[in-house]
């Protein structure tokens, strides 16, 4: 089954189920740690097919997606080219910066920030092929994680600081397409006003709640509210951004 031949209803249903259950998780520690989330011996035939399909979608998006190409350009401008080889790429088993892999149920993937002693360009993104069911879903996911990467490179984010984490989650949810009108309707979230803002807050709280430094949902809600005004209106690297409205 390919992106072009898949039953549109099935693709929409699978994508909705994945998005309803999956928020963009607290950044994973290191791509090296999860470079083979499922070994070839444990991958099913469906996992292998999904991984190959996702690799093709990724290559297509890097060539044709205005959003993905924009983020690649602006990451490169701040010396964080996501497509360049790693400094230690000659080492056997070193994963690419954009890693497509099959993942077990407890790994959702996400942005993997570089350790403090390493250049921010050595960060990366893990994309779990068996959790992504359409090219559009992959496009939004890559865009979301690249906004985290841009923040990490531009602002040297401390991901253990809840205010830093909340700010990047607000920006990523708002700017990536995560909270566009159609996506929210597919998630069964509808509001007569401020639908975009409600989505950004909800998804920001979910992500911050997954941070080990966050002790409760109330704490996550308070942190998101505390940084909301400055972070929601910060649209860098975009000059301006048009939010969906109804």
UniProtKB/Swiss-Prot annotation:
InterPro entries: Peptidase_M76_ATP23 (IPR019165). A divalent metal cation binds at residues 144, 148. The active site is at 145. Its main location: mitochondrion. One of its GO terms (cellular component) is mitochondrial inner membrane. GO terms for biological process: mitochondrial protein processing; mitochondrial proton-transporting ATP synthase complex assembly. Keywords: Hydrolase, Membrane, Metal-binding, Metalloprotease, Mitochondrion, Mitochondrion inner membrane, Protease. GO terms for molecular function: metal ion binding; metalloendopeptidase activity. It comes from the Eukaryota. It holds the Pfam family Peptidase_M76. Its EC number is 3.4.24.-. Belongs to the peptidase M76 family. Has a dual role in the assembly of mitochondrial ATPase. Acts as a protease that removes N-terminal residues of mitochondrial ATPase CF(0) subunit 6 at the intermembrane space side. Also involved in the correct assembly of the membrane-embedded ATPase CF(0) particle, probably mediating association of subunit 6 with the subunit 9 ring. PANTHER family: MITOCHONDRIAL INNER MEMBRANE PROTEASE, MITOCHONDRIAL INNER MEMBRANE PROTEASE ATP23 HOMOLOG. This is Mitochondrial inner membrane protease ATP23. It comes from Malassezia globosa (strain ATCC MYA-4612 / CBS 7966).
């Amino acid at each position: 089954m390919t992106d072009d031949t898949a039953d549109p209803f099935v693709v929409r249903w699978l994508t909705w189920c994945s998005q309803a259950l999956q928020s963009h998780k607290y950044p994973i520690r290191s791509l090296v740690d999860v470079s083979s989330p499922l070994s070839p011996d444990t991958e099913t035939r469906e996992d292998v097919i999904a991984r190959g399909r996702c690799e093709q979608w990724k290559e297509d998006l890097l060539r044709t997606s205005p959003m993905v190409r924009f983020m690649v350009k602006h990451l490169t401008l701040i010396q964080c080219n996501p497509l360049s080889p790693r400094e230690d790429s000659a080492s056997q088993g070193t994963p690419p910066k954009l890693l497509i892999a099959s993942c077990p149920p407890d790994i959702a993937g996400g942005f993997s920030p570089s350790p403090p002693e390493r250049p921010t360009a050595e960060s990366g993104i893990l994309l779990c092929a068996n959790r992504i069911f359409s090219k559009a879903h992959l496009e939004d996911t890559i865009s979301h994680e690249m906004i985290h990467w841009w923040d990490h490179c531009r602002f040297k984010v401390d991901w253990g600081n809840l205010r830093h984490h909340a700010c990047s989650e607000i920006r990523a949810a708002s700017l990536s397409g995560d909270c566009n009108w159609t996506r929210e309707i597919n998630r069964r979230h509808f509001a007569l006003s401020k639908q975009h803002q409600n989505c950004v807050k909800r998804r920001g709280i979910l992500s911050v709640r997954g941070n080990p430094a966050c002790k409760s949902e109330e704490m996550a809600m308070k942190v998101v509210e505390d940084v909301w005004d400055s972070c929601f209106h910060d649209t860098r690297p975009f000059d301006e951004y048009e939010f969906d409205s109804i």
